[in-house]
Amino acid sequence: MPEVSTDDLDERQVQLMAEMCILVDENDRRIGAETKKNCHLNENIERGLLHRAFSVFLFNTENKLLLQQRSDAKITFPGCFTNTCCSHPLSNPSELEENDAIGVRRAAQRRLKAELGIPMEEVPPEEINYLTRIHYKAQSDSIWGEHEIDYILLVKKNVTLNPDPNEIKSYCYVTKEELEELIGKAAHGEIKITPWFQIIADTFLFKWWDNLNRLNLFVDHEKIHRM
């Protein structure tokens, strides 16, 4: 694996780069494990390194979507606006368990607490709805990027928030119209949004949003959408 200096990066975020992500093939079959750092180096991504991830979309009971702005300390896509929570299940027994994506949903519960301070009892895995998966690749800069099989998870619930400033610069609940305005600002270069959030907003998000009480219509655990 290539050696890249992390001396100028945020110390806490560098520590997280030692976490072990789950390596998968293009059909999401587990083939091993690798550090978060190595999974996010463009040099490895160009060789085909692919890992498992998830994206949470949390709506409150007013049907507003919780967005976050990633902190400037983040190594990939710092300062970008994105969906509620985006991270990775780890290569450990609890989060490797694949039946009904329970391992991924446990990882989502863990990261909702770590990033947004949401008490774990407020988002039990059984209330995190697994819809489908997308496969995408994106560069953050010349060194870092993403190449993921991304599990799409939806939650509809009012939650308690206490964000970690090392993870999150700001957050807000938005209506559909407010999100469209935000996407417009990104198109004009006024703000930045993450590529996976842009992809999902351009394809599926508004259809899901219109049917939050009928999400079963959109459950597809067989297909991996190639983006």
Swiss-Prot record:
One MF annotation (Gene Ontology) recorded for this entry: isopentenyl-diphosphate delta-isomerase activity
Active site residues according to the UniProt entry: C86, E148
Domain called Nudix hydrolase: residue spans: 49-199
Gene3D superfamilies: Nucleoside Triphosphate Pyrophosphohydrolase (3.90.79.10)
Enzyme Commission identifier(s): 5.3.3.2
Chief location bin: other
First-level EC class: isomerase
One term under GO cellular component: cytoplasm
Keywords for this protein: Acetylation, Cholesterol biosynthesis, Cholesterol metabolism, Isomerase, Isoprene biosynthesis, Lipid biosynthesis, Lipid metabolism, Magnesium, Metal-binding, Peroxisome, Steroid biosynthesis, Steroid metabolism, Sterol biosynthesis, Sterol metabolism
Signal sequence segment: none
Annotated binding of substrate, by residue: K36, R70, K74, S87
Catalytic activity: isopentenyl diphosphate = dimethylallyl diphosphate
CDD domains reported for this sequence: NUDIX_IPP_Isomerase (cd02885)
Binding site for Mg(2+): H40, H51, E146, E148
Cofactor notes: Binds 1 Mg(2+) ion per subunit.
Record-stated family: Belongs to the IPP isomerase type 1 family.
Quaternary assembly: Monomer.
Role: Catalyzes the 1,3-allylic rearrangement of the homoallylic substrate isopentenyl (IPP) to its highly electrophilic allylic isomer, dimethylallyl diphosphate (DMAPP).
Protein name: Isopentenyl-diphosphate Delta-isomerase 1
Organism annotation: Bos taurus (Bovine)
